[in-house]
């Protein structure tokens, strides 16, 4: 559940989803409601918001045919926000719901933010981040508390993106463990005790960036998806 309210209009949102969270949203269901008067461009605005929120969470890479995101406006407030006002409010709501979905993902013990910096394009940044988010070896390493930057590089290298495999920097929870694709700081100084794990990958081929949220791969995820008959 997420809410936005000022003295002119209000936006509220709800979402359901614990597994199969991946573009195109998989089995996730979300409804966002506002009392604002929506502009003719509401669909376009909401698509941009979804592309940068719901479509940038990726729990397990599995998709389905049953995803839905709805934006509903009653116009009851009588206030018509500007496009930028509306987009900002929707980003707040959908961003919060996206983070909550990943935090509540099946079997999750860690929320993982994978930030790509200095990519050739935003789409390349998304591709590299998503390749890491869907890499089971990397997700298992995070579950085990292993700051294995080699798995980060290996995952990044599978992406269909412009990169130089010899010049990539990697930070794990703020510790630069890899510079120009070679060891840097002692990886044992990386602390994975907190719920949030931050992976920063600097491709050094441009100035675009993007972040994907995912989670680790645990025993509980395997159990929850195997201990029943469909």
Question: How should these model regions be labeled?
Answer:
Residues 1-230:
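A structural signal for small-residue-enriched, beta-sheet-centric alpha/beta enzyme cores
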């Amino acid at each position: 559940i997420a809410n936005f309210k000022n003295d002119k209009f209000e936006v509220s949102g709800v979402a359901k989803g614990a597994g199969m969270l991946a573009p195109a949203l998989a089995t996730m269901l979300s409804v966002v409601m506002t009392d604002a008067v929506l502009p003719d461009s509401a669909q376009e605005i909401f698509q941009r918001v979804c592309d940068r929120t719901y479509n940038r969470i990726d729990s397990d890479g599995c998709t389905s045919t049953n995803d839905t995101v709805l934006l509903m406006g009653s116009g009851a407030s009588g206030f018509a926000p500007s496009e930028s006002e509306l987009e900002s409010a929707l980003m707040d709501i959908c961003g919060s719901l996206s983070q909550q979905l990943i935090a509540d993902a099946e079997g999750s013990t860690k929320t993982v933010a994978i930030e790509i910096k200095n990519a050739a394009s935003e789409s390349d940044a998304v591709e590299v981040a998503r390749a890491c988010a869907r890499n089971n070896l990397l997700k298992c390493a995070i579950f085990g508390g292993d700051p294995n930057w080699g798995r980060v590089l290996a995952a990044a290298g599978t992406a269909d993106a412009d990169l130089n495999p010899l010049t990539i920097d990697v930070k794990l929870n703020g510790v630069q463990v890899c510079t120009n694709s070679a060891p840097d700081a002692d990886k044992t100084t990386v602390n994975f005790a907190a719920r949030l794990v931050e992976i920063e990958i600097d491709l050094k081929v441009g100035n675009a960036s993007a972040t994907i949220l995912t989670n680790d791969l645990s025993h509980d995820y395997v159990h929850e998806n195997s201990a029943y008959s469909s």
